[in-house]
A protein has these predicted regions:
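Hydrophobic transmembrane alpha-helices
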Residues: 1-125, 132-197, 201-220, 227-291
Length: 291
């Protein structure tokens, strides 16, 4: 569409506020529609009786349109695709303005592209997550997928699009280090998540590996070692999980920090994602350890 002139990709970054507003409205609309549909069709799940709480947390667990699980579809197909398109839009704007794309903006295109790829190619692992099998599809999840993730995790992209490259220029060795660290962190994140999810599927007898590109090495463990807890849960102690308790969280946060660091140190705004995500991961660790 961009090459044909039908749609300029720079419009996303140029009209960032308008796109964000539409996404917010869509988040509210889908939340209300999903809630009342569940109530009227008697498909509610674990209701408290308090409207505000139930609307926020959700009424339906896994609403569907035909064979499509809306919660699973919205978790990947909306937020990460939008975030990747915002990064591409920022790169296109720099190319139009300067005649080149800075290594910093190219870094964000690579980073968001890798994350989108990891989520899309590993969709068979998503049903194993807490978000899918326990959390309901309410305002908290819907609004965050429609507006929160794509329009807050992109602050470094917006910052670089609004400021000259001199504000966030690094030396060549620094770029090499940051790119290398991103790729290593993503490898650990992607492969450790795959190890955990496929281990669970191995125990359930449901493992079916998809060979979507790229499949990182060490993503599927053969005869993995694990501990059996008093509560009957099996804890993986093989692969990345033999070295630390939360390799996926550590690598995921490293990526988040790099997303901010690539925009330099003149503003704290690009670091919003890493600070927010640290709070989220701290809460998740507490929840996991309690379980």
């Amino acid at each position: 569409l961009r090459l044909s002139g039908v749609y300029r990709l720079t419009q996303i970054i140029e009209h960032f506020g308008e796109y964000m507003t539409v996404s917010m409205i869509a988040g509210f609309a889908v939340s209300f529609a999903t809630y009342f549909h569940a109530v009227f069709t008697h498909t509610t799940h674990r209701m408290s009786g308090n409207f505000m709480y139930d609307f926020f947390m959700g009424a339906a667990l896994n609403p569907r349109i035909g064979p499509i699980d809306l919660k699973m579809w919205a978790e990947v197909r909306i937020p990460w695709v939008l975030l990747f398109m915002i990064s591409v839009s920022g790169a296109c704007q720099q190319y139009e303005q300067y005649g080149y794309v800075t290594p910093n903006m190219a870094f964000m295109v690579l980073a968001t592209g890798l994350y989108l790829n990891a989520c899309a190619k590993g969709e068979e692992c998503i049903p194993q997550t807490w978000d899918m099998f326990h959390e309901k599809w309410g305002f908290m999840v819907i609004f965050w997928n429609f507006a929160g993730v794509p329009f807050t995790y992109c602050y470094s992209i917006v910052y670089m699009a609004a400021h000259p490259p001199e504000y966030y220029r690094f030396s060549t060795p620094t770029y090499v280090f940051m790119y290398a660290l991103l790729l290593f962190a993503h490898f650990v994140f992607d492969s450790s998540m795959a190890q955990k999810s496929r281990f669970r599927m191995q125990l359930q007898g449901t493992l079916k590996v998809r060979w979507s590109f790229p499949q990182w090495p060490w993503s599927t463990l053969s005869n993995p070692r694990y501990l059996q807890t008093e509560h009957g849960n099996a804890l993986l102690i093989d692969g990345w999980w033999q070295f630390l308790r939360k390799p996926n969280y550590t690598a995921d946060w490293t990526q988040a920090f790099l997303w901010g660091a690539i925009a330099g140190t003149r503003s704290v705004i690009p670091y919003y994602y890493s600070v927010f995500f640290l709070a989220v991961l701290t809460h998740r660790c507490g929840r996991d350890f309690e379980r």
